[in-house]
Regions:
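Short N-terminal "domain-start" leader segments
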Residues: 1-22, 83, 87-101
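Surface-exposed beta-loop interaction hotspot
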Residues: 55-96
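Short, intrinsically disordered low-complexity segments
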Residues: 108-141
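Short, conserved charged micro-motifs
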Residues: 50, 88-91, 130-137
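Short aromatic-glycine-(Arg/Gly/Cys) micro-motifs in beta-strand/loop hairpins
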Residues: 16-40, 75, 98-117
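Conserved short beta-strand edge segments in small beta-sheet-based binding/regulatory domains
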Residues: 68-70, 144-161
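A short, exposed loop/beta-hairpin motif centered on an aromatic-Gly-Thr core
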Residues: 34-50, 122-128
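A short, charged, amphipathic alpha-helix used as a generic interaction element across diverse proteins
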Residues: 46-63, 135-143
Length: 166
């Protein structure tokens, strides 16, 4: 997946594209960061190797319009901890990861990097652009499930001091 951002006067816009081999199409997801974006598909009848070239040309067009690639420095860590869960329940772990990935991804605000159970409970590390909006979105997504109770969201300062966000 290719992910690009463009800074507006008051907000960031996102543009994401990837090739779906099975369907022989490009999926494109666009919108304002922090707001549910729109998605559309572009059909293609080209061979797979030409699809990468076509995607690169598309990326070049978007960059000419002011979009830039997302770097690790653009993303802030958001930790989502469930004290009452552990990694033994693999299905639950993957379900929560999917919920986090979906709620952050559909708003162009980030993604979930997976879970860790070394700190007590189960902790998911997400990488986000706008941490305040991500907290709102994650809390809302979890509120709609049975996983909301007992969740804690936090991040770290550059000096490794912990900041509790909920």
């Amino acid at each position: 997946m290719i992910r690009l951002l463009k800074k507006g006067e008051k907000e960031w816009w996102f543009w994401e594209a990837w090739y779906e081999e099975k369907e022989a199409l490009y999926a494109v997801h666009v919108g304002t960061v922090g707001v549910k974006g729109g998605q559309y598909s572009v059909l293609t009848d080209q061979a797979a190797e030409n699809n990468l070239q076509a995607l690169q040309e598309w990326i070049n067009e978007m960059k000419a319009e002011g979009y830039v690639g997302v770097t690790t420095e653009d993303l802030q860590p958001l930790h989502v901890q469930f004290f009452h869960l552990d990694a033994e329940d693999v299905e639950t772990r993957y379900l929560i990861e999917q919920i986090l990935d979906e709620c952050l991804g559909m708003t162009g605000n980030g993604h979930c990097d997976g879970g860790d159970d070394s700190r007590g409970g189960l902790v998911f590390i997400c990488r986000v652009l706008q941490i305040d909006q991500a907290v709102v979105d994650v809390r809302q997504a979890l509120r709609e499930t049975s996983f909301f109770e007992g969740v804690s969201l936090f991040t770290f300062h550059s000096d490794n001091s912990c900041i509790i966000l909920t």
